[in-house]
Amino acid sequence: MQISQFNRLKRSALLFASVLLLSACQIESEPKSEFEQIQERGVLRVGTLNNQLSYYIGPDGPAGLDYELARKFAEQLGVKLEIRPAFRQAELFPALKKGDIDIIATGLNQTSQAVQRFRPGPAYYYVSQQVVYKKGQLRPRDVDQLIKYQESKDEKAGNEDSNAGAETLQIVEQSQFVPTLTALQKEHPELQFEIIGDADTRDLLKHVSTGELRFTVTDSVELSLAQRLYPDLALAFELTEDQPVSWFTRRSEDESLYAMLIEFFGNIKQSGELATLEEKYIGHIEAFDYVDTRAFIRALDNTLPKWSPLFQKYSEEFDWRLIAALAYQESHWKPKAKSPTGVRGMMMLTLPTAKSVGVTDRLDPEQSVRGGVEYLRRIVARVPDSINEHEKIWFALASYNVGYGHMMDARRLTKAQGGDPNAWADVKERLPLLRQKRYYSQTRYGYARGDEARNYVENIRRYYQSIIGHVSQKPAIDEDTEDLQVIPPLDPNLLVSGAVETLAEQVSGAVEVTPPPEENAPQEAEQTPVPKAE
């Protein structure tokens, strides 16, 4: 009896142990959340497009709106950032679906097709989809006029089966424009378009500019950026109203990463960091001067190559392309430039400023560039540390133009009106008020042409963006997705201007950068009327 009891107890103990073991196995085999997997891996894998808005390699390492946002998100998660750049949008969604990347961060529209398959994050800016044509050519003002043009092309081809109409309108494969035109085609069966798989939107915009293609579709921000390189591009008509732009994650029951993304964008919106980054990358793109841009593009091809070695030689902690943009704003890269106000030379220095920086001959381009950079360096050093490092340069350039005291007056006025005196987006709106007596009479330094200072800085920013795009339209980035770089979170104290060690050494192997083939009044430039976009 005792043996039987013992056997029963033994079997019960074994059964209990088996249950515990099975439970432990189930607990161990329970899949980890997406966020936990990223933490365990120690790396956030981000897919993005290689362009001058989302991600590119500058003299000081990686840059771009989506890159900087992704870097901040990785820092919040406590992991390193792995950027997986692509030249074509068609590469991104398949990579996300397969699990090769965790997030797409490149400013894509929340189209119905994309939202059905993937989960969009919070909107961080808005764009409209626009039909683009070449200035001086036929401008369709709506879909019906576009169809009439395509039909006329078919008739000229003399073949009912001709694809001539479709060839007049091309869009990129798997772009947000495909579902828009597909839906439009259901309403207008005569509408023809061709989907291109071996090009990106910038390629098609270039083809429109050169006359190889009649029409394409892009978004409003991309068009504004592209016009700085291809000034012949113009808006024909809008296909959509403003649509939200966001990042994308995989759709699944696991919302751990998505929840972190919601929290991240909520935090940076509330702190003002998002507004600061958007001002940095797209706050200057709205104004477009067709005549000025055409002249600038010609100068990029014909004049910049002569002077770029000089800008690179003396730029030091500054991006040489920024110094080039400053010099173009001052003199249009003319070393003998003179103004009735007394400023002269490549950097249009006043005589007192020239003496203060050791320039003996203002018409000597080497002395002028060296002196201009030194003067700018001194102004940057005076800008208050309460201003973000990457925005200090805009305050310094405003001071370069209108004087440091007037710039500080504009900051004080901004604060008095409830704005942020450390945000260029707020201060630039108050600079023009320094012309009005009701405002300048209450300032320390009085009247100033603050509107000119604002335009001066915004012009330099546009020239700078154009030079970036011009010298690195096709950067040498390794497209092999098996060999990708890991970029660690950056020390927030690093100077964006590059006064510290750059990231160039950190970004190696997977990304190769091809070397590119005080009151200082600016020269009064003659303003040419801008023709209407027809």
From Swiss-Prot:
It is a peripheral membrane protein. It is an enzyme of class 4 (lyase). It catalyses: Exolytic cleavage of the (1->4)-beta-glycosidic linkage between N-acetylmuramic acid (MurNAc) and N-acetylglucosamine (GlcNAc) residues in peptidoglycan, from either the reducing or the non-reducing ends of the peptidoglycan chains, with concomitant formation of a 1,6-anhydrobond in the MurNAc residue. It comes from the Bacteria. GO terms for biological process: cell wall macromolecule catabolic process; cell wall organization; peptidoglycan catabolic process. InterPro entries: Lysozyme-like_dom_sf, MltF, Solute-binding_3/MltF_N, Transglyc_AS, Transglycosylase_SLT_dom_1. Keywords: Cell outer membrane, Cell wall biogenesis/degradation, Lyase, Membrane, Signal. The active site is at 330. Residues 507-534 are annotated as: Disordered. GO terms for molecular function: peptidoglycan lytic transglycosylase activity. Residues 1-24 form the signal peptide. Coiled coil: none annotated. Residues 520-534 have a biased composition (Low complexity). Residues 25-285 are annotated as: Non-LT domain. GO terms for cellular component: cell outer membrane. It is found in: Cell outer membrane. Residues 287-534 are annotated as: LT domain. Its EC number is 4.2.2.n1. The N-terminal domain does not have lytic activity and probably modulates enzymatic activity. The C-terminal domain is the catalytic active domain. In the N-terminal section; belongs to the bacterial solute-binding protein 3 family. Murein-degrading enzyme that degrades murein glycan strands and insoluble, high-molecular weight murein sacculi, with the concomitant formation of a 1,6-anhydromuramoyl product. Lytic transglycosylases (LTs) play an integral role in the metabolism of the peptidoglycan (PG) sacculus. Their lytic action creates space within the PG sacculus to allow for its expansion as well as for the insertion of various structures such as secretion systems and flagella. This is Membrane-bound lytic murein transglycosylase F. It comes from Vibrio campbellii (strain ATCC BAA-1116). The gene is mltF.
